[in-house]
Amino acid sequence: MERALRGSWILLLAVLALAGAPADACAQTATQQREAAVLKARAGQMAEAQALLRAMLASGVDDGLVAMDLVTLLQQDGKPADAVAVFEKAAKPDPPDYALVAATRAYRDLGRYDDAARLARAGTRRFPGDSVWPLLLSLVLSDAGRTAEALEVLRTPAAARAAPVERLLAEGYAWRRAGNTGAALNVYGEAIRLSRGNQGVRSEAAGVLLDVGAPWGAAAIAGNTRPIEGQQAGAMVRWGEQVRAPEPARRFDGTDAALARLDALLAALPTDDKDLRRRLRLDRLVALRDRVRMKEAMEEGDALSADGPLPAFAEQAYGDALLYMRRPEDARDAYNRILAQSPKDVQARYGAFFAAVELDDFATAYATIDLLTSEQPVWRSYRNDPARHDNPERGYAETMAAQARYYGNQLGEAWDRLVKLSDAAPANGNTRLALYQVANGRGWPRRAQEEAEIAAGLAPRDLGSRIALIEVAINAYRFTEAERMLDELRALYPEDLAVRRLARDLDAKRRWLLEVKVQPSSSDGGGTNAAGQALISEARLYSPPIADNWRLFALGDYSYANPPEGFVQRGRAGGGVEWRVPWLTATVYPTQSWGTLVKAGGGATVDWWVTDHIELSGSAELFSADTPLRALLFGITANEYAAKATYRWHESRSVAASFAYLPFTDGNQRVAGGLTYKERLINIPRFDLTGRAEAYASTNTLGGLTPYYNPSQDLSLVGGLLAEHVLWRRYDNSLVQALSADAGLYAEQGYASNWIGTLNYEHRWRFDPLTEFRYGVMLMRRVYDGSVENTLGFTIGLRQRI
């Protein structure tokens, strides 16, 4: 700005000086004034010289060459746009050779190659004896990508008259622009010989090697200049990422060396060399990303992008750092800036895909990965090889497209895609790992373990395989083994997000676990079986694993109701031990109840996963928690013996049959059974709709003869829907709203059948891996001995690892 203001004042003073002189004096001294301005430029007073020439033009003082000299000075001063503007305004039909050369170079500097070539051809015609014109025309044609024409121009007699070194430099430039490195180096080598090692010629030759990423070769030709040293450091960055030691502990050696070199160059660089400093910082940004020093990379990217747009290679590194640092919106924007310039950039497209996944934008994620997959050919072919070869990039993209469905909770579609890929390429470790993940998600631990072990067998040193084996150990309650394997990974890969997540998960599994549920309610109706104001609450506290397979636990329950006979309550406390091995869990616990009735009790449970699809459960409990509260007012209790069999096809479909036998102390014997079928009807990202059909029946030997609700025989047939919608998710934290509604028929012997129903709405918060919290409201309609009871209830639940 200061320079512009200074130039404006100089121009104003020059105009005033000229305006104050007699007109005939100005005309008589135009040439002298022009030449005086040129002399000022030669003396280094470029701004003053340009201002004087502009003032002469503005005052009409011109000998026909003022504009031409101004064009020349502007081009020499690095102002091609101004030079072209003056040249075009002058519209001189026969500009002198020096001005024509300057205008041609100005057009070339602006990338207006057609205009530059037009002027160069005009110069060739007007000044056939001047060899600068064929050389300049050749350079312009090379810049325009018309290298064959450029080489033809250099073969003309006019070009042959040029100085050999100048002609060879033009030819070398043409070959360089054509991408023929060998021919360019051959020509430049001859130019170096003829020029007796001229440094300028050596620098031109070194540029060829810099173009092809050979800065050490460039240094051998031209010496270690700062730009070449910068290129060497950039090459070290690329090699550090591409060529890594097989030992994981040394995988960053090359990148660390590159960072040290860049830091040294930046420390020694003069502050005024801003262009090279920015280039070194851009390379350093990439190196920081490769070294997974992501916070530093993000901060460097923030600073560099504030100074101007980033080139694609740096924008990619910046986006990767932003994604790592959990700034997915900014990462998406960075990748999109790359794609705006290069829509087919594969790295940027994968980055945009992962950013969309983190943002729960699965419409964009699916579209991105599916398009990328479709554009990858199934086969690759190579020159002089008639055979077709598998394209590994296609396989990777197809696997990632399947995993996208896994991320979107569409496990069925993900599984079908992956099985097809695995059947076609059974030795693909990446696909096997993806199968492991989805099998885990579908609740198939045996299949998951099988896939993890296959993947580890195919690539035992692969980080993903090693993580999978640790997860298998955790799921099998082999916590000590998992900790040992995890310690090895943390020592080698402390920066890896998957390793960090695994450490958090293992830590969570080895903590205390508190589970609490509270359900207050208020009922009206129900006749003599009305519950009135009521509460059901229960809590369990589990210890951390003991010797991997054991846990101690304490339990506490408290319930109350207000039947017609009055207030009744039951408190229960107990403690027990849980034993867990793969596929089997068993517990045993004694209890003590107090309140309306004081009595000891206890129980035992066993759950056996016979296969990935079949689960058998059994339980026995003395003074069962299912004893009706109203019965306690009369000193009546019940034991319970129950069994359940479940068949799960997968996470979206299951059928279960249950049986329970409750002998009461008053002689009543209750037998109950049920059948439940569930199937997910709609499964899209962020939303699931599950249908449920249930049949339940019971019989009591003292039906209708007890002081508690005790139908002789009853049957309920209910159907319902459960809608689950992810309202918000941010990495480990999420909020889901769930609405369930069911209705059906209830039939009781001796009474008219009636309809029953339940409507429940709740919020579920998750702060993985430690906290789950839910709360909701429920409306129920039930029928007892022909009387309808309506209930308003609330639910609060907490699952907290401590």
Would you name each region that the model predicts?
Residues 22-69, 76, 85, 230-233, ...:
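N-terminal leader/linker segments that initiate helical-solenoid repeat arrays
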Residues 9-20:
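Bacterial N-terminal signal peptides
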Residues 47, 78-85, 523-530:
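Inter-helical turn/loop elements of alpha-helical hairpins
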Residues 29, 72, 101-102, 118, ...:
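Gram-negative and organellar
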Residues 18-23, 608:
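Short hydrophobic alpha-helical membrane-anchoring segments
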